[in-house]
Regions:
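Helicase motor core with emphasis on the C-terminal RecA-like subdomain
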Residues: 6-11, 15-21, 42-48, 60-158, ...
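Extended, highly charged accessory segments
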Residues: 529-532, 536-600, 664, 672-914
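Short, well-ordered loop/turn sites that connect or cap secondary structure elements
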Residues: 595-597, 628, 634
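Short, basic/aromatic beta-hairpin or loop at an interaction surface
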Residues: 598-619
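Short beta-strand-centered aromatic/proline hotspots
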Residues: 639-646
Length: 914
């Protein structure tokens, strides 16, 4: 591993005079990271460059290739056309985001133009190094133009590279010498990464010699594994910046007591004192410590916006914390030039954008004497939300940026943000990766970020430039979120990020890439197997699994009534050859890539109950709907609803006030807290709790009655006084209620009676949904076997909730949750195939494996049609013992969705009492 060192005076002597002159005009000197990267790249070695955002990685990757292209173009400019190098792409840049690719293409124009001008000024020919971009937004005419006249540098995405390799456009790639993969960390741990790894090996098969691979990554663990992902069978040198990013991260709570939020005063809307006037405290029951089932469910529901956000909750006179958060955010936006506000869901992104615009309009309206009682008008969708209402004042302070915003609007927001013309953007992870946003001087995060790695990326958007200090604040919405925010902040300061694990032997991705490769060439099965095994995610692929995929694609499971199992390729076993069938190439490009269609069901009232037809209550994840039946009681927001009907795309509900209900989940927003982060969370709670109850706290009392060591730790983590106070009071309240704090070493089982007289058994655990979901499955299986009823288990990041009917027998407790590790593994493996998760993931895997034909290239069938067809396929597939996509679906559930390794280790610790 090469560590960045101090720059040397001769770092640029390896480049031409023109490149050196341009660089020194643009920058004071190379960064240590750039110099180390150039040492490796100059020698032709593969390189993985790891550094925080804004450290000059991209220019480090491109500059050698640009210099070589410029010299070659200048040297051959006077030669006859037939003696010049042939047309073709020389540098291939792959980005996980189209926006990032477009940003890189824009940023390349300055060095290309500047270096070319210097060469011309020195008396040489004006070299022209051309760039081009191919993504899903590229029109057919543009694609044909790229094929006729390929650029020297092509910017693309993993999916578009696959499409090029599966068409005649691949001929333009036979000249590639350098492949740059940006944001490697965002790809390596997913099926998208496995797909790209196979595409890179297919690309190498086209070339006379393997291309030099350069990977760019934010801070990542483990480095060697990511390097192996990048290089496949080839060695990769890791160049890493060992210094921690320069950050100033704060955790801010805008009220003194989050369980007794003062009513937000309507007249105090300006300046930092916003919200201090108004009525006295009014207790918010859902924010109390975890004293009951209702309180825990409220705490576990912290990832969703309060139900009344679109009505009284975010309005004047409310005792919600939201008006205080909104006012604090607006104060920060007005105090800075440009601000990004990150949130964790698209719905919250839209709502917060609308509220900031609304609040800004009201502040300006008061200043200008605008009639604030004028009729409200919807915010225009290009400026904010279509889901909320705002006064007629123009919404000029904030715009939304997320995956559902149109391409044109996203580009407009990015341009305005980069130019410093837009004061605020509210975004999801769509702006998390390395788009150059050097004008951003503040990042705010509402609720804790999904992980420490994500937090580093998001806060790193501020001052995204060499030497810039990133400044950001996290606004928890509940007391329990303060814990997650503090853990994220501490993890950022200490560089403790979560590990990335490669997705291994994904058979659905293998099936898609096999059809694509065979569509272009007749292949020897053994040669294709060797190509596949060169890719790191498939380096341990068993030949038996490989052959099972070939058998499936060759029609082994074809039946008269299921065309989806009909053969995609021909496998000539006698000759060991793989051949295309008519239409193979079309099938390969119709459903390219790995990003799944994830579906949501609208939740509506019956017709006639709403003022204007069916009134929308919310939406549910399709996996939640698969688990639901007519008559079930569910919670949306703070209300309970009884399901009266489930249609192909809607759930029709009726109010069920006062009824005990299941809490919904949404897998589309992420898989939940990593177990590693949960362990950090538990250790943090254990340390803080010890500082409250120990002798040290009494002897050396710091702020809020905690030990000096804990007080100093919380302050170093960036918690303001109110954040510290609320965190300490949460821990005290929990100890008063149960006598013990759940942490990484101590899991707490709590029992209480619910509203209907049944018992709730709750397991408090920090280890996250990926651990808790399979654990809850095993517990449900045990309860059914012993007691004969369904416990209606619900798992979330903070634990498991069971519903136990009131009986005369002894109420079960901790014995429900303790398992032999191997027994638990067996139960989960046996039961996973009957879960809603399995059904939903089977549909996605079947689509990736090209078993569900779309309507047309790039167009998906309606989700209800996909679900119907997938159900038929699943029923047929279950009759085959080792159907590859059943095997893959089980692998995805057990390895990618569930964290069975962490659960197994946890059960071993429970057994050992450690």
């Amino acid at each position: 591993m090469d560590e960045a060192r101090e720059p040397t005076p001769h770092a640029l002597t390896r480049f031409s005079d023109e490149v050196r002159g341009w660089f020194l005009d643009a920058f004071p000197e190379p960064t240590p990271l750039q110099e180390c990267a150039w040492d490796v790249i100059e020698g032709g070695e593969n390189a993985l460059v790891i550094a925080p955002t804004g450290s000059g990685k991209t220019l480090a990757a491109f500059l050698f290739a640009i210099d070589e292209l410029m010299r070659e173009k200048a040297a051959t400019a006077g030669l006859p056309k037939k003696e010049r190098p042939g047309k073709g792409v020389r540098v291939l840049y792959i980005s996980p985001l189209k926006a990032l690719g477009a940003d890189v293409e824009r940023n390349l124009q300055a060095p290309l133009a500047g270096i070319a001008a210097r060469m011309a000024a020195a008396g040489g020919a004006m070299p022209e190094v051309r760039t081009g971009m191919r993504t899903g937004d590229t029109t057919p005419d543009q694609r044909r133009s790229l094929q006729r006249n390929p650029p020297d540098i092509l910017i693309t995405t993993p999916e578009s590279l696959y499409l090029m390799l599966t068409s005649q456009a691949r001929e333009t790639l036979r000249t590639v010498e350098t492949v740059i993969v940006d944001e490697v960390h965002a790809l390596a741990g997913s099926k998208r990464g496995a797909h790209l790894a196979l595409s890179l090996e297919r690309l190498d098969d086209l070339l006379e010699k393997p291309a030099q691979r350069i990977g760019l990554s934010a801070t990542v663990r483990p480095r060697d594994e990511i390097a192996r992902f990048l290089g496949g069978p080839h060695p990769v040198r890791v160049v890493a910046s060992e210094g921690r990013p320069d950050m100033d991260v704060r955790v801010r709570v805008p009220v003194r007591d989050m369980t007794a939020v003062p009513t937000f005063g309507g007249s105090d809307l300006t300046g930092g004192a916003a919200g201090k006037r108004g009525g006295g405290p009014r207790r918010a029951p859902a924010e109390e410590a975890w004293k009951s089932d209702r309180a825990l469910r409220a705490a576990m529901a912290k990832s969703s916006l309060p139900a009344s956000t679109t009505s009284p909750d975010s309005r004047l006179g409310s005792s919600s914390i939201w008006p205080y958060i909104e006012a604090s955010i607006l104060d920060e936006v007005l105090a800075h030039r440009t601000t990004i506000v990150f949130v964790n869901s698209r719905g919250l992104c839209e709502k917060l954008t609308a509220r900031l615009n609304d609040l800004y309009a009201k502040r300006m309206g008061i200043a200008r004497g605008v009639d604030m009682d004028a009729p409200a008008a919807p915010i225009r969708s290009d400026l904010g939300s279509t889901a909320d209402m705002s006064t007629g004042a123009p919404a000029v302070i904030a715009k939304a940026h997320h995956g559902s915003v149109s391409k044109e609007k996203r580009l407009q927001v990015e341009r305005e943000l980069k130019a410093g013309e837009l004061p605020c953007v509210v975004a999801t992870s769509s702006l998390e990766l390395g788009i150059d946003m050097g004008s951003i001087d503040l990042v705010l995060q509402v609720a804790a970020p999904p992980s420490v790695a994500s937090a580093l990326q998001r806060i790193g958007r501020a001052n995204h430039q060499v030497g810039g200090r990133s400044t950001g604040s996290i606004f928890p919405r509940t007391r329990t979120e303060i814990i997650d925010a503090a853990v994220a902040a501490e993890g950022m300061y200490e560089g403790r990020i979560e590990q990335t694990a490669l997705v291994k032997n994904a058979l659905d991705v293998l099936a898609q890439q096999t059809v694509a490769a065979v569509a272009m060439d007749e292949l020897a099965a053994d040669d294709w197997f060797d190509t596949v095994r060169r890719a790191a995610p498939y380096s341990e692929l068993p030949r038996r699994a490989f052959d099972s995929v070939l058998s499936m694609l060759a029609g082994r499971y074809a039946t008269a009534d299921l065309a989806e199992f009909s053969p995609r390729i021909v496998w000539d076993r006698e000759r060991g050859r793989l051949l295309a069938r008519p239409g193979t190439q079309r099938q390969a490009v119709m459903s390219a890539g790995t990003i799944p269609d994830r579906g949501m069901f609208s939740v509506v009232l019956p017709e006639g109950d709403g003022a204007q037809g069916r009134r929308r209550v919310g939406e549910l994840d399709e996996e939640m709907v698969y688990e639901s039946r007519v008559g079930d009681i569910i919670t949306l927001g703070t209300s309970s609803w009884r399901i009266s009907e489930i249609t192909r795309d809607r759930v029709i509900v009726e109010p069920a006030p006062g009824r005990s209900a299941r809490l919904p989940f949404w897998h589309g927003e992420g898989v939940g807290r990593p177990a590693e982060t949960g362990r950090m969370r538990g250790a943090f709670l254990r340390a803080v709790a010890a500082g409250i109850e120990g002798d040290d706290a009494e002897a050396e009392e710091g702020g809020f009655g905690v030990s000096c060591a804990v007080s100093e730790r919380l302050a170093a983590d960036g918690l303001d006084d109110d954040a510290q106070r609320n965190l300490v009071e949460l821990i005290r309240s929990q100890r008063a209620a149960t006598g013990i704090i759940p942490d990484d070493k101590t899991l707490v089982v709590e029992r209480c009676e619910d509203e209907q007289g049944d018992w709730r058994v709750l397991l408090h655990s920090p280890y996250g949904r990926r651990v808790h979901e399979p654990w809850a499955m095993a517990v449900s299986d045990r309860i059914m076997a012993i007691y004969g009823y369904d416990a209606q288990a619900m798992a979330a990041d903070d634990g498991i909730v069971l519903r136990i009917p009131m009986t005369e027998t002894r109420l079960p407790g901790i014995e429900l949750f303790a398992f032999d590790p191997d027994e638990l593994d067996r139960i989960v493996r046996d039961r996973v195939g009957s879960t809603s998760l399995f059904s939903a993931r089977f549909r996605e895997c079947a689509a990736r494996a090209l078993l569900m034909s779309p309507i047309a290239p790039g167009k998906r069938a309606p989700l209800w049609q996909q679900r119907l067809k997938a159900g038929q396929l699943l029923e047929a597939a279950r009759r085959e013992r080792e159907f590859p996509i059943l095997v893959e679906t089980a692998r995805e559930c057990l390895q990618d969705v569930y964290d069975m390794r962490a659960l197994h280790e946890l059960m071993e610790q429970v057994q050992a009492g450690s």
